[in-house]
Amino acid sequence: MNFNNVFRWHLPFLFLMLMTFRAAAADTLLILGDSLSAGYRMAANAAWPALLNDKWQSRASVVNGSISGDTSQQGLSRLPALLKQHQPRWVLVELGGNDGLRGFQPQQTEQTLRTILQTIKAANAQPLLMQIRLPANYGRRYNEAFSAIYPKLAKEFDIPLLPFFMEEVYLKPQWMQDDGIHPNRDAQPFIADWMATRLAPLVKHDSSNS
């Protein structure tokens, strides 16, 4: 057997396999969030990003970079290492809720989120932004100023703005933890399905991005 001929015959196939593997490896969706995505008081594999990853095995690898209690500034401080480690193609930003709950100035949160989006773009990844809303008892003026951050940034960066999934969860008291803030384990499959529907048109493969 002429091994040189065999090697030459298989080389294009091996190259194609390598490029396919590299492309697949690059198709990662990173979730940069707080306790709403981290799976507060539950195992990590029960949280909605893990369920979405199970559902999306052929579409994208979902990496949950969320940490309970994170403010937008804390998310920003972790972002460069996450981008370097996972080299995601898309990054969903679900941050700001803890800023609002702690009474941070909306302008401060806006600027931090702006820096997050700039950092993602600089890493050649596609940022996706989630609308965040606060409980009504934080006052109309503060709530309006806070909520306005997200559509403003989405327009500024020309990026998708996803609805706040918790607005659906709040309608089902049986899906809420005792603190009235966090979704419980029973809510996670619904959130995963809800997010899958809204992310599917955004997290897709095309030849222009290959």
Residue ranges of model-derived segments:
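A detector of low-complexity, intrinsically disordered, Ser/Thr/Gly/Pro/Ala-rich segments
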Residues: 2-4, 17-18, 26, 89
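Bacterial N-terminal signal peptides
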Residues: 10-20
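Alpha-helical cap/lid subdomain in secreted, periplasmic
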Residues: 3-5, 76-210
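Serine-esterase "nucleophile elbow" of acetyl-processing enzymes
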Residues: 23-87
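Bacterial N-terminal signal peptides that target proteins for export
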Residues: 1-11
